[in-house]
Amino acid sequence: MDCRVTHFKEKDSFISKLKESDKSLLEFYQYNPVETASFTTKMKRPNNGREKQLAQIIKDYMADLKLTTSQLEHIEALEQGAKVVIGGQQAGLFGGPLYTFHKILSIVTLSSQLTKEYGETVVPVFWIAGEDHDFDEVNHTYVYNAKEAQLKKVKYHTMTPPETNVSRYTPDKEAMLNALNLFFEELKETNHSKPLYKLCVDIINEFDTWTDIFKALLHAVFKEHGVLLIDAQNDKLRQLEKPLLKQIVTNHSKINQVFRQTQEQTIASGLTQMIQTDTNVHLFLHEDGMRQLISKEDNLFKLSKSDITYSEEELIELIETEPERFSNNVVTRPVMEEWLFNTVAFIGGPSEIKYWAELNNVFKLLNVEMPIVLPRMKMTYMMERTQKLLKQYSLNVEKVIQNGIDDDKNEFVREKASDTFIQQVEELKAKHENVYQQLLNEVKENQDNFNLVTKNEEIHNKQFDYLLKRYLLNIERENDISMRQFRELDLVLHPHHGLQERIWNPLQIMNDFGIDVFSPSTFPPLEYTFDQIIIKP
């Protein structure tokens, strides 16, 4: 496999500012992510003292998996106080979307680099957001049908979607297998299809909960990299979190205050508001089979979906006796993650690293240091056919990845069309505009007639536009093979008007490139970069 790093002009000004060490942005973070000194400082930070307990919790959590030598070594290193590079994601159907795998590759790449540079093990850790309850975000994925040049949605269907954490949800195996079959029906048959299908079927049959199925797939793919996995909703992990959970409850008012103030500061500095939440407590409680947001009202802690109330003392007692019923929201989750781990760097998606800026003073209030915050690496895969089509139409791959195919397709159609016809239609439209302007001048004193002429002009202009549009559409129909090929390029390189990794599923890449495509022996060696990476066979 070939790997090419390509520099694009960054569309996201936030990422550009981060790369350029913009002071107005960095004031909301505690470390500059592009300075070597930041990593040196973080590597020297004293440990938090929770590493032995944490290593045992992860070992227990992964006990139902066959661990590799590198994973066992990383658990031992973690126990001895090794620093980590960490990132996380919700448990998407069949591991999707593709950027989930790219997050893990980013974590692996950076941890490996730091291990070499500092001569001590830095452990790659992936945090499964099993505490999340928004099932609509994880119950579907997309598959590209190359034969039809169509991108199709595949969904896990259930009449009773969970209202609690996805970690507590046990999906119907038959429905999962049905979704898997629908996915594979759309894939082209390759030498990798049958073993890949068997891998997925075996995982679905062996594991029961939604996040355990997700965990097993990630393990199968990334075990040789030594990646350690942990579910945010793990009961033993929640036991370890009790001290900070209690702090969050007792300091909920101050936490909310500094969060809102920092958010106002980020907005005033020109950043877009990322976190939308009405709560003033920033914790959830599992009650009546539902994950319910806690808020403070009239000196009582209330739940979002029931009439049950708690005093502060009762909540503290509940944390002590049943901590597994609690979970963090978007404001407290990052702080909890960093309280648990001795982290050098956190790797997240563009939206994630933006909302961490709004939490700077929450970290400080709870005396938890924010790690170095970095965006995940962006990767796009090019199949041989994609390369062939790009060459056939003399297209720039970087342009198509970033902007899509519309401009190139329209240029192609215009070249096939009659310049004379288009020019005459445009001239005719211009002549009519002149005539209508004269008519409007004649009737400007009479509002009814003025409106009549204006409306009539709109009708005629629409007809001219329709004529030109239909003419060009007929050109497209005459070149239907080329139009299909342009659509194919768009769905592969710029699906749904965005990056491939935001829509495509990892199984698609494994089916095309090989079931071991993401393993260290196959995947091209990477160095962490802000730039776009293009990967081809």
UniProtKB/Swiss-Prot annotation:
Q: What is its EC number?
A: 6.-.-.-
Q: Which GO terms describe its molecular function?
A: ligase activity
Coiled-coil residue spans:
383-451
Which keywords annotate this record? Coiled coil, Ligase
InterPro entries, alphabetically? Answer: Bacillithiol_biosynth_BshC (IPR011199), CC_BshC (IPR055399), Rossmann-like_BshC (IPR055398)
In terms of Pfam families, this protein maps to: CC_BshC, Rossmann-like_BshC
Q: What does this protein do?
A: Involved in bacillithiol (BSH) biosynthesis. May catalyze the last step of the pathway, the addition of cysteine to glucosamine malate (GlcN-Mal) to generate BSH.
Q: Which HAMAP family match?
A: BshC
Q: Say which family it is in.
A: Belongs to the BshC family.
Q: What is this protein called?
A: Putative cysteine ligase BshC
The coding gene here is bshC
